[in-house]
Amino acid sequence: MKARAIVVTSGKGGVGKTTTTANLGAALAKLGEKVAVVDVDVGLRNLDVVMGLEGRVVFDLVDVLEGRARLRQALIRDKRVENLFLLPASQTKDKEALDPERFKEVVRALLEEEGFDRVLIDSPAGIEKGFQTAAAPAEGALVVVNPEVSSVRDADRIIGLLEAREVRENFLVINRLRPRMVARGDMLSVEDVVEILGLKPIGIIPEDEQVIVSTNQGEPLVLKG
């Protein structure tokens, strides 16, 4: 994937978007890239918790957007893996505090001034201002989808909005696949999801209780063992 600014989105909440962002960011950092993961879910931030960094948040994205903090002040370096940084969302503001144009400048600064190789943007669920802000600087997208009808339907809507914004380098992450349910005809197959949505899967992730354990422990699964 060539895109450097990538929005991780879904439409439907609870499909594993934040977990995907955290693990992909950690994996890319382990491969040697300098990575910033950015939480745009203002008012409902979780990326800091999933990464085990919630106790180190001093400034946040809205502080940067509104000029109360410099970008470097708000970035939190992960001590477990070199070159992985978090820009957390605000817990106390609402999404009206977001400004898509100013957010584009923040992402530009991360790439051009701070020297990041990749910026992963954790989008809020839905298609309102939070999504619009998260998608504004994106060159590509990872659409996280569960193999169920409601998730696929919402993902289809999101893909249309991304294409309307000329975000073209888009891929699927099919999460929480249960092969036994697929075999019984109780869950959509990978082929079903790909045919409906028309995007190539870049990752297929089976249901795994270790993901829940690692999330509760604040340690991305790719950093274990």
Predicted features, each with a name:
Residues A5-R70, R118:
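Walker A/P-loop NTP-binding active-site region of P-loop NTPases
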Residues V40-E114, I212-Q217, L221-V222:
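P-loop/Walker-type NTP enzyme "switch/lid" segment
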Residues V42-L44, T92-K93, G126, E148-S150, ...:
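Conserved nucleotide-binding/hydrolysis micro-motifs of P-loop NTPases
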Residues G115-G130:
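Glycine-rich phosphate-binding loop used to anchor ATP phosphates in small-molecule kinases
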Residues R118, G140-V143, F171, G203:
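Well-ordered beta-strand positions
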Residues E128-V149:
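Inter-motif core of Ras-like GTPase G domains
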Residues R153-R168:
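Conserved C-terminal guanine-recognition region of P-loop GTPase G domains, centered on the G4
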Residues A164-G225:
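C-terminal lobe/tail of nucleotide-utilizing enzymes
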